[in-house]
């Protein structure tokens, strides 16, 4: 969950998000090392009084500044490609949910059940109860079981939207007439908030996403209750 004055990412709630956090630290460390080296060279060149006007070329230096950047790029690219493959890999999902973007709300359909679906609207500020978050709460949450592979099919009915939940490391564009898919595994119980991440009109900022991860037995009770109320 995000908090005021936060500088870093939200706490990871899925294996993919944990990998993204590790990659961020890895890339940031490389950037800091390069920046420190460049700053040191600039300061040394400006502050020194020594000059050498006879060195016009140096094959050794040219080899170093060609090979070293290539090695650095490889060190960044390899873990990045690994995470890209992990994000695209969807093996034997236990549950498939279709998320449809509308102006300006989300609708969810649990395709493994015959008649389990609902619309999810933002709770107005005047209807919030103590402990709820402004512009982030919905009247119906997308409930999923913990530690189960979940596939989310994302589309839109009218304009471009984007289904994103930072804690779970998922963000997928919702395009009219196109069915995109993403997947995640909630590694711990909790309530995870997201928002539409594509400008979609006047009420774009009023399209929150709430994913609630619960133990399997609680999910079964919830799905049974929803089917009975349908």
From Swiss-Prot:
Highest taxon of the lineage: Eukaryota
InterPro entries assigned to the protein according to its UniProt record, in alphabetical order: CcO_II, CcO_II-like_C, CcO_II_C, Copper_CuA, Cupredoxin, Cyt_c_oxidase_su2, Cyt_c_oxidase_su2_TM_dom, Cyt_c_oxidase_su2_TM_sf
Membrane-spanning ranges: 15-45, 60-87
UniProt binding sites for Mg(2+): 198
Sequence positions that bind Cu cation A2: 196, 198, 200, 204
Cellular localization per UniProt: Mitochondrion inner membrane
Membrane topology annotation: Multi-pass membrane protein
PROSITE patterns found in the cross-reference section: COX2 (PS00078), COX2_CUA (PS50857), COX2_TM (PS50999)
EC number, UniProt record: 7.1.1.9
Main location (coarse class): mitochondrion
Cofactor dependence: Cu cation
EC category: translocase
One GO term (biological process): ATP synthesis coupled electron transport
Known partners and oligomeric status: Component of the cytochrome c oxidase (complex IV, CIV), a multisubunit enzyme composed of 14 subunits. The complex is composed of a catalytic core of 3 subunits MT-CO1, MT-CO2 and MT-CO3, encoded in the mitochondrial DNA, and 11 supernumerary subunits COX4I, COX5A, COX5B, COX6A, COX6B, COX6C, COX7A, COX7B, COX7C, COX8 and NDUFA4, which are encoded in the nuclear genome.
Function field: Component of the cytochrome c oxidase, the last enzyme in the mitochondrial electron transport chain which drives oxidative phosphorylation. The respiratory chain contains 3 multisubunit complexes succinate dehydrogenase (complex II, CII), ubiquinol-cytochrome c oxidoreductase (cytochrome b-c1 complex, complex III, CIII) and cytochrome c oxidase (complex IV, CIV), that cooperate to transfer electrons derived from NADH and succinate to molecular oxygen, creating an electrochemical gradient over the inner membrane that drives transmembrane transport and the ATP synthase.
Family: Belongs to the cytochrome c oxidase subunit 2 family.
UniProt-recorded name of the protein: Cytochrome c oxidase subunit 2
Species: Salmo salar (Atlantic salmon)
Name of the gene this protein is made from: mt-co2
